[in-house]
Regions:
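Short beta-strand-loop/turn "lid" adjacent to the catalytic site in phosphate-handling enzymes
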Residues: 31, 45-81
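Short glycine-rich, Thr/Ser-proximal phosphate-binding strand/loop in the N-terminal lobe
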Residues: 3-42
Length: 82
């Protein structure tokens, strides 16, 4: 089973969580600009992860609707904020 990721694009910070089997990793980066494909790649690479390593990616936070529906054939699931 491939790992999965969730990214929260906040106003000040971008939080990333990757679940790989029984292990969960988390890291936070300062938010820089609007979310786009390049930004997703940068925040994942900060944790040593590529979109190709993942089964899918969930995204939430501001302007997630601007993101493509997939990156490297990995579906981006847009999650509404609560």
């Amino acid at each position: 089973m491939h790992p999965v990721a969730a990214i929260d694009f906040g106003a000040s910070n971008t939080d990333v969580v990757v679940r790989d089997g029984g292990a969960t990793r988390h890291w936070t980066l300062p938010t820089e600009g609007q979310p786009d494909e390049a930004r997703i790649r940068r925040v994942l690479e900060a944790g040593g992860v590529s979109p190709r390593d993942l089964a899918w990616i969930a995204v939430t936070g501001g302007n997630r609707a601007l993101l493509p529906s997939a990156i490297d054939d990995r579906v981006l699931h847009r999650v509404d904020e609560v």
